[in-house]
């Protein structure tokens, strides 16, 4: 069995990878992908801790988190499509300049 510290380290690395993607990228699609990675890392941490404590609470939180992530992804992609049709770009800086 893999220890708790290794498993939570993996979840933390995934979370940091998503956060790095959000901080570095200027494209809205990549920001949405980074956010999804962060949400999935948090869900993984819920499952790991629930398994460690021997309770099903982690799996319940995982189902809730995945449901919220799916909702966020569908709404986010719909907004991205609308922005792309209107501005013909997904670059945050260009959209901000065009808005003024």
UniProtKB/Swiss-Prot annotation:
Any one GO biological process: ATP synthesis coupled electron transport
Q: What EC identifiers does the entry list?
A: 7.1.1.-
Q: Which residues cross the membrane?
A: 4-24, 29-49, 60-80
Q: What organism, scientifically named, is this protein from?
A: Baumannia cicadellinicola subsp. Homalodisca coagulata
Question: What is the protein name given in its UniProt record?
Answer: NADH-quinone oxidoreductase subunit K
Cellular component GO terms, alphabetically? NADH dehydrogenase complex; plasma membrane
Query: Which superkingdom is the protein from?
Result: Bacteria
Gene name, please?
A: nuoK
Q: Which InterPro entries does the record associate with it? A: NADH_UbQ_OxRdtase_chain4L/K (IPR001133), NUOK/Mnh_C1-like (IPR039428)
Keywords recorded for this protein, A-Z: Cell membrane, Membrane, NAD, Quinone, Translocase, Transmembrane, Transmembrane helix, Transport, Ubiquinone
> Which GO MF term does the entry hold, naming one?
quinone binding
Principal localization reads membrane
Q: Kindly give the membrane topology term recorded for this protein.
A: Multi-pass membrane protein
Matching PANTHER family: NADH-UBIQUINONE OXIDOREDUCTASE CHAIN 4L, NADH-UBIQUINONE OXIDOREDUCTASE SUBUNIT ND4L
């Amino acid at each position: 069995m893999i220890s708790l510290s290794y498993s939570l380290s993996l979840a933390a690395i995934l979370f940091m990878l998503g956060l790095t993607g959000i901080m570095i990228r200027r494209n809205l699609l990549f920001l949405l992908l980074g956010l999804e990675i962060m949400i999935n890392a948090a869900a993984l941490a819920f499952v790991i801790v629930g398994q460690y404590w021997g309770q099903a609470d982690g799996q319940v939180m995982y189902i809730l988190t995945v449901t919220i992530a799916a909702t966020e992804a569908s709404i986010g992609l719909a907004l991205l499509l609308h922005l792309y049709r209107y501005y013909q770009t997904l670059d945050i800086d260009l959209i901000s300049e065009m808005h003024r």
